[in-house]
Amino acid sequence: MAVSLWQQCIGRLQDELSAQQFSMWIRPLQAEMDGDTLVLYAPNRFVLDWVRDKYINIINQFFTEQMGNDAPKLRFDIGSRPSAKKPEPAPVAAVRVPNPQTKASVGTSFNTTEPVANANHRSNINPTYQFDNFVEGKSNQLGKAAALQVAENPGGAYNPLFLYGGTGLGKTHLLHAVGNGIIKNNPDAKVVYMHSERFVQDMVKALQNNAIEEFKRYYRSVDALFIDDIQFFANKDRSQEEFFHTFNALLEGNHQIILTSDRYPKEIDGVEDRLKSRFGWGLTVAIEPPELETRVAILMRKAQESGINLPDEVAFFIAKRLRSNVRELEGALNRVIANANFTGRPITIDFVREALRDLLALQEKLVTIDNIQKTVAEYYKIKMADMLSKRRSRSVARPRQVAMALSKELTNQSLPEIGDAFGGRDHTTVLHACRKIAQLREESHDIKEDYANLIRTLSS
């Protein structure tokens, strides 16, 4: 009875949570009765703590609504429920000790000059990129959580893991952190990280050297394959064909795949639909530009690593003006530190204004959300107040969605920051608006023309 109630509760949670949250935190749970107590089994401590902290009230409330005083007690545990049938052992484990004939290590690419059985993987997982030095915030929290679980259980629930977002937001850092985590747990694991262009280059070399079979065996024998910037596969038909079969072979063997891109999988032009579909089989997570608090934390961490005492007010000054990505922040701080070391002057706000004069001047010329809202309101002849209101009529909602999409494209603000600027809306509302307008620009000539006109107005 209580287990059946849990199935109903799952339905409620699926309605209330985003698809991403449900897939990451609720789907992995297993339920079983132990006397008058319903035990929820989580795959690891991280999921257990998260569900207990974030969702316990929703679960208990649902049980009380359905059964009143007869609602079961709730307990959490780690592992699989005792009655769960033991799975048949996979032909190849998620992280396995390789064949003695093949030296296992961390690899970068296929070598066409050696027989595949003797191919030696050169280490290219950067040991400096760890979970411990990845600064976490709302913008990347889900991405880090998913990466941690993959490192702990490669080939498990989130396979493939697809991370997408703009340049310099930490996607590559997470790839290396997962690789380091897997190797720490199993030093013999064969982990391959590469840029998508390297995969293409390796395939071309294999074709030139009549070594395509060795190429296939190499890539299909790894324990974990991480490919950065998958969007560069666009319009490379033969590479997509080979990757399609490699992808299928690795997933069938429960080997972990992580992919990154600068855009949502279905928005990658020039990539076959069958690949886009497979990219979404596991878990897809957006990595957004960091919010103010995270930008400050990144600056303080970087300064600490450099042995510099960065005043709080200086960190906030820089973080409020540079919003686009982590690399830009770190580059600006490096320039400040270099100038301070060269001149011997203390790091103050006035000193930072001088050291970053050209960079700050460029930022001040950028389009703001306020300008976008006013321009769109004037264009569609609606009130500025409507842009922030809760009104849902199409005459107001569509311009609001256009303004949100323009804000994402033309500013450095994160989705949560854009949502706040539109009357405190949730970041998922902004994401929906961006996807809706992208779709309408393909389907509606009027929306496409409106959007282009607004871009020209705002950029002039």
UniProtKB/Swiss-Prot annotation:
MF annotations from Gene Ontology: ATP binding; ATP hydrolysis activity; DNA replication origin binding; lipid binding
Chain residue ranges for the region called Domain I, interacts with DnaA modulators: 1-84
Gene Ontology terms: cellular component: cytoplasm; plasma membrane
Cellular location(s): Cytoplasm
Keywords (A to Z) from UniProt: ATP-binding, Cytoplasm, DNA replication, DNA-binding, Lipid-binding, Nucleotide-binding
Record remark on domains: Domain I is involved in oligomerization and binding regulators, domain II is flexibile and of varying length in different bacteria, domain III forms the AAA+ region, while domain IV binds dsDNA.
Summary of the function given for this chain in its UniProt record: Plays an essential role in the initiation and regulation of chromosomal replication. ATP-DnaA binds to the origin of replication (oriC) to initiate formation of the DNA replication initiation complex once per cell cycle. Binds the DnaA box (a 9 base pair repeat at the origin) and separates the double-stranded (ds)DNA. Forms a right-handed helical filament on oriC DNA; dsDNA binds to the exterior of the filament while single-stranded (ss)DNA is stabiized in the filament's interior.
This protein's name: Chromosomal replication initiator protein DnaA
The organism of origin for this protein: Shewanella sp. (strain ANA-3)
Gene, per the UniProt record: dnaA
